[in-house]
Structures are given as structure tokens and as C-alpha cells.
Curated annotation (Swiss-Prot):
Coarse class of the protein's main subcellular location: membrane
Family recorded in the similarity comment: Belongs to the CDP-alcohol phosphatidyltransferase class-I family.
GO cellular component: plasma membrane
Name under which the protein is recorded: CDP-diacylglycerol--serine O-phosphatidyltransferase
Phenotype reported upon loss of the gene: Cells appear normal, no effect on flotillin cluster numbers or size.
Subcellular location per the Swiss-Prot or TrEMBL entry: Cell membrane
TM stretches of this protein: 4-24, 28-48, 77-97, 116-136, 140-160
Record-annotated disulphide pairs: none
Organism: Bacillus subtilis (strain 168)
Amino acid sequence: MNYIPCMITIGNFICGLLAIHSLLYHNIHSAVLFIFTGMFLDFFDGMAARKLNAVSDMGRELDSFADLVTFGVAPSMLAYSVALYTLPFIGILCALTYSICGMLRLSKFNIEQSKLPTFIGMPIPFAGMCLVILSFTYNPILLAIGTCGLSYLMVSKIKFPHFKKHAAENLESGRWN
């Protein structure tokens, strides 16, 4: 049973890879579906690990790799595919910056703050969701500004509530307040 949380995390990783694959074939809607499916799996992997008493350093590292692909690389490729490509140099720079800031944010989280009650910097799954939604404006200027803003928020010192942790605790205990 200890392998179940890692299998859920690997499912998240696979969703990220399939989102990227979909984008290579210009299948935008499938890419979005895979990103949101990865988000669903990401919500439950930690909960499953705690419930099965299977929390591990390896699981935490796998989760970061999966999150980087599903919420760092795939959304930036989506943003580039739908609108940022029309801004030749700026568009690729924005997409790269977002992915790099996502990588930095995940690394910093693993080292410094995994036990804090709030996040320092915007969590990458939330940033990824915002970027996916923002991509559907199909406005390259707005998307470039939004991508840079989300990049900054991920590496900022701004505190964000730990919604996933509170939701998981409430779900695990069977109560919703």
C-alpha cells in the first residue's frame, strides 16, 4: 500500500507529459484536460501518503518533479502555443521565465518551508491553473504580462494560504467547516 501515493504522483507526471505531447500536435483542449487531471491527482497524492502512513523524502521529490512538468512546463508551453508565439523574443522569454521560476519555487519549498502553515510564494499548481485560464484570453500582451506576474509571485516572499492542506485535513477528518 505504501506505493499508492507514488503511483498517484506518477499519474500527475504522466498527465504533464501528455499535456506537452498534446501541444506538440496543437491539441490545446486535450492539453488543458491533462493539466487539470494532473491537478486533481496532485491534490490526492499527499493525502494518500498521510492516510497510508507512507510520507517519504522520495515521495516529496517525485511530487516536485511531477509538479514542475504538469504546472511549470506544460502551462508555459500552452501559453506560448496559444498566443505568446506572436511575440517572437518576448514570448519565449516569458515562457522560459515562468518555468524557471516554477523550478526555483519548488526547490525553495523543498528546502525551506514544507512544514509552515502558509506558503511563501504562490504555489505552482495554483500558478499553473491561473496561467491555463489566462491563456484562453488569446491576448499575447495580457498573457505576457500575466506570465511575468505569475513568475514573480511564485518566487516572491508573499504569503499564500495553504488551501490544499486545510482541505485535505477536513476531507480526511470527514468534516467541512
